A protein has these predicted regions:
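Conserved C-terminal portion of the radical SAM core fold
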Residues: 84-87, 133, 156-215, 227-243
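Active-site-proximal loop/turn and secondary-structure-junction residues that shape catalytic pockets
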Residues: 34-36, 91-93, 118-122, 140-142, ...
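N-terminal pre-triad scaffold of radical SAM enzymes
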Residues: 12-55, 62-69, 75-79, 83-86
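Active-site phosphate/pyrophosphate- and oxyanion-stabilizing loops and adjacent acidic/basic residues
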Residues: 17, 104, 231
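N-terminal small/glycine-rich loop or linker at the start of catalytic domains
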Residues: 29-60, 145, 163, 167-174, ...
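Catalytic cores of alpha/beta
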Residues: 121-130, 180-195, 249-261
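Auxiliary Fe-S-binding modules of radical SAM enzymes
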Residues: 1-4, 195-331
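Core AdoMet radical
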Residues: 51-73, 77-98, 102-127, 131-165, ...
Length: 331
């Protein structure tokens, strides 16, 4: 991009907002990725926290979360009105049957099918109605650049998996990270990918520069750049579900991303932010877009009892999540 036209960007955002309102996108969801493990057998994506952990984890089984802890988190999300963005885990952290069992239990807790983001797999036929959709961690839609940032996740294999998912009746999603060094012109690759593979949902994230990665000294993408990408995609794909992630140090992005076409927002530490000034800020950002918020970051009554309402084996984890939510973590 040789020159930046701020007027053009603002016009795109305005058009995207008008389109969103016309489509009835007046409710914004709070989304939470539920992690299964901190181990990834690939462990070489240039930006990823897990890439810094692979050589430190001597026993990968110890990096797996307890299943009851995962299920308790899902129950708390349900109580607070949060959507589960997807189940996420590094390669070879859980078997397909283990993931299926976890998803079945979450489905029974929330009453909703689960999205998966658990890597490239040829075993999609093992899943059933407990799964709503399959997410491909594309990260960068420019094929040549994607090879650099995710060398062990071939884009053609992700694409084949998503096409198979569609054939099996699952919805299809992809994740895209902005701020990796891509150009705005790469949005054309993204358009082509969404169109070619009939993608139902795109989840955008801004780069989080993790220590010990190549991006440690990189900045997060500019808010208007992020907004321009999102508004461009919204205008091109009116029916696409768009989720946008931002970090606690960039909460001011929320409002402009919603106006740019986001249906939901993600990437928040739920139990750390709940009831704090940061949780309130999220709700205020949504309020000033004229949308309503599905779920809460502040209503303590929604936390519910300190015992599980579905399985007593989850009690200790429910109690801990509620206790963590009631602490003021940002004094």
């Amino acid at each position: 991009m040789n020159s930046i036209n701020s007027t053009e960007t603002l016009e795109l955002i305005t058009k995207a907002n008008n389109l969103s309102l016309k489509k009835g996108y007046d409710e914004i969801s709070l989304e939470r990725a539920v992690f299964l493990s901190w181990w990834c057998d690939k462990g070489d994506c240039k930006f990823c926290y897990m890439s810094t952990q692979k050589n430190k984890i001597k026993d990968p089984t110890k990096a797996k979360r307890r299943v009851n802890n995962i299920l308790a988190e899902a129950e708390m999300c349900s109580r607070l009105g949060w959507n589960i963005e997807f189940l996420s885990g590094g390669y070879k952290s859980f078997t397909t049957q283990e993931i299926k069992s976890i998803a079945e239990n979450i489905h029974s807790i929330t009453g909703d099918g689960v999205w998966l983001n658990t890597g490239i797999t040829s075993e999609l036929k093992e899943y059933g109605t407990e799964i709503k959709g399959i997410t491909g961690a594309v990260e960068a839609a420019n094929p040549e650049f994607q090879k650099i940032v995710c060398p062990s996740k071939p884009l053609d294999q992700i694409s084949d998996m998503l096409d198979t998912a569609g054939d099996l009746g699952f919805k299809k999603a992809i994740t895209i990270i902005l701020g990796l060094g891509e150009s705005f012109e790469d949005v054309e690759y993204l358009k082509d990918y969404i169109r070619e593979h009939k993608i139902d949902r795109v989840i955008f994230y801004s780069l989080n520069p993790h220590p010990e990665t190549e991006y440690v000294n990189s900045s997060q993408p500019a808010s208007l750049y992020y907004a321009k990408v999102v508004s461009t995609i919204r205008l091109e794909f009116p029916d696409l579900e768009i989720i946008c992630g931002t970090w606690t140090d960039n909460l001011a992005n929320i409002g402009i991303l919603i106006l740019s076409g986001a249906n939901g927002i993600t990437k928040f530490p739920l139990f750390k932010m709940f009831g704090t000034k940061y949780g309130k800020r999220v709700e205020e950002e949504v309020k000033w877009t004229g949308r309503t918020l599905k779920g809460t970051f502040t209503d303590k009554s929604k936390l519910g009892p300190e015992k599980s309402e579905v399985n007593p084996e989850l009690d200790q984890y429910i109690k801990r999540y509620i206790k963590d939510s009631l602490k003021n973590k940002y004094k």
